[in-house]
Curated annotation (Swiss-Prot):
GO terms for biological process: mRNA processing; RNA splicing; tRNA processing. The lineage of its organism: Eukaryota, Viridiplantae, Streptophyta, Embryophyta, Tracheophyta. It comes from Hamamelis virginiana (Witch-hazel). GO terms for cellular component: chloroplast. This is Maturase K. Disulfide bonds: none annotated.
Length: 504
């Protein structure tokens, strides 16, 4: 935030919400590509930083000054005089700068709203792994869970209308429409499935901003019981996920509820309702009855459609009983099961056998989807049999091993919280043998002969750092070592889902 305040005349911007002139300032583009704004962890530039320079930025600004309007036809975009020969580069640079500009009002409001409030500031709570200790603590006492697929707007103009509440500069909103129509397949912008449009791939920062502003709109309904929620929020998509920014919207929602929904306000008084979200999926769990969960389901659908104009269907919300259902979230399969235990109690001459069943939150790695992800990445076939990677056969041996080891360690690091490690051992086996097949193919040898020549060195490379430390401290055969290998570990440095663990 200090970087923004150092460069911008914030008092003027705050009074008039007039942001459009900032698009002509060179330092905006410097901020857009500055890796010191705590953004480098979340977003990586998409390969044009080597082409961007102060000279290109100045040339771009000169062209914008000379052009009287920003009108573009999708059919005639290749000959647009505003963009010229460097259409893709210039358009991408403008969109990156524009993303910085429209974030300013939200950043200012976040700073002012956080002042004087006691909110957990630990960076550890940014980790998406912090969600699982929260689930372990809360879900053992709940009965039902709803898997919610996030609804999408009927038309992208709704995204522009959403921003009008915060950005009151008409020129900036027109520029946003310009970017929507600049790219083909723009209707797939919000689609979280396989092929996100060219727009979202080449304009990641702007895409995440729009997506989160859209999600926070309909998510603001849950602010009514935010006092019962945990501060373990995922901030992997940026600071916009902090719902504290939307106090203005709450005021409006209170009026709506009081006037139109007085009869159903009791729904919000459930102290055992908990909500978590990541990307396009959210989980809503409660200790209530099936009737209460179904009322929530149809109420949310109608509320989103009538007041936020987002298309949703009851079929996108799945209600299940926690005791006999496993829900897929963040690459893990989670469930609440009963762990039976038998206790023998003896009092004088009489003895009793007491059966106890303790609830246990079980988290495992779904092996079939993970093998499917590895098969898509050409590490194995659909049955899980390792295959070689011919695309990497031209690299050096050390480079090939490093790449496989990095993938293996990242997966082990991400899935370290699994209750059962057998799935991880199988994944390690697939990656290790795929690496050996790739190297053997490169050297025109058999896998057996290559592994015999390489010895145990390849196996040691695939050990994670924590396994290497434990192997030095404890003997492999000791019970302490085995318990630590099997133990569940959550790492608070993970702020985004692993690509191979993202099965959507």
């Amino acid at each position: 935030m200090e970087e923004f305040q150092g460069y911008l005349e914030l008092d003027k911007s705050r009074q008039h919400d007039f942001l459009y002139p900032l698009i002509f300032q060179e330092y905006i583009y410097a901020l857009a590509h500055d890796h010191g704004l705590n953004r480098s962890i979340l977003l990586e530039n998409v390969g044009y930083d080597n082409k961007s320079s102060s000279l290109i930025v100045k040339r771009l600004i000169t062209r914008m000054y000379q052009q009287n309007h920003l009108i573009i036809s999708v059919n005639d975009s290749n000959q647009n005089p505003f963009l010229g020969h460097n259409k893709n580069l210039y358009s991408q640079m403008i969109s990156e700068g524009f993303a910085v500009i429209v974030e300013i009002p939200f950043s200012l409001r976040s700073v002012s709203s956080l002042e004087g409030k006691e909110i957990v500031q630990s960076h550890n709570l940014r980790s998406i792994h912090s969600i699982f200790p929260f689930l372990e603590d809360k879900f053992l006492h709940l009965n039902y869970v709803s898997d919610i697929l996030i609804p999408h707007p009927i038309h992208l103009e709704i995204l522009v209308q959403t921003l009008r509440y915060w950005v009151k500069d008409a020129s900036s909103l027109h520029l946003l429409r310009f970017f929507f129509y600049e790219y083909y397949n723009w209707n797939s912008l919000i689609t979280p499935k396989k092929s996100i449009s060219i727009f979202s791939k080449r304009n990641q920062r702007l895409f995440l901003f729009l997506y989160n502003s859209h999600v926070c709109e309909y998510e603001s309904i849950f602010l009514f019981f935010r006092n019962q929620s945990s501060y373990l929020r995922s901030t992997s998509s940026g600071a916009l996920l902090e719902r504290i920014y939307f106090y203005g919207k709450i005021k409006h929602l209170v009026e709506v509820f009081v006037n139109d929904f007085q009869a159903i306000l009791w729904l919000f008084k459930d102290p055992f309702m908990h909500y978590v979200r990541y990307q396009g999926k959210s989980i809503l769990a409660s200790k209530g009855t099936p009737l209460l969960m179904n009322k929530w389901k149809y109420y949310l659908v109608n509320f989103w459609q009538c007041h936020f104009y987002v298309w949703s269907q009851p079929g996108r919300i799945y209600i299940n009983q926690l005791s006999n259902h496993s829900f897929d979230f963040l690459g893990y399969l989670s469930s609440v099961g009963l762990n039976p235990s038998v206790v023998r109690s003896q009092m004088l001459e009489n003895s009793f056998i007491i059966d106890n069943a303790i609830k246990k939150f079980d988290i495992i790695v779904p092996i079939i989807p993970l093998i499917g992800s590895l098969a898509k990445a050409k590490f194995c076939n659909v049955l899980g049999h390792p295959i070689s990677k011919p695309a990497r056969a031209d690299s050096s041996d050390s480079d090939i091993i490093d790449r496989f080891v990095r993938i293996c360690r990242n997966l082990s690091h991400y899935h370290s919280g699994s209750s059962k490690k057998k799935s991880l051992y199988r994944i390690k086996y697939i990656l290790r043998l795929s690496c050996a097949r790739t190297l053997a193919r490169k050297h025109k040898s058999t896998v057996r002969a290559f592994l015999k020549r390489l010895g145990s060195g390849l196996l040691e490379e695939f050990l994670t750092e924590e396994e290497q430390v434990l192997s030095l401290i404890f003997p492999k055969a000791s019970s302490t070592s085995r318990r630590l290998y099997r133990g569940r570990i959550w790492y608070f440095d993970i702020i985004s889902i692993n690509d191979l663990a993202n099965y959507e």
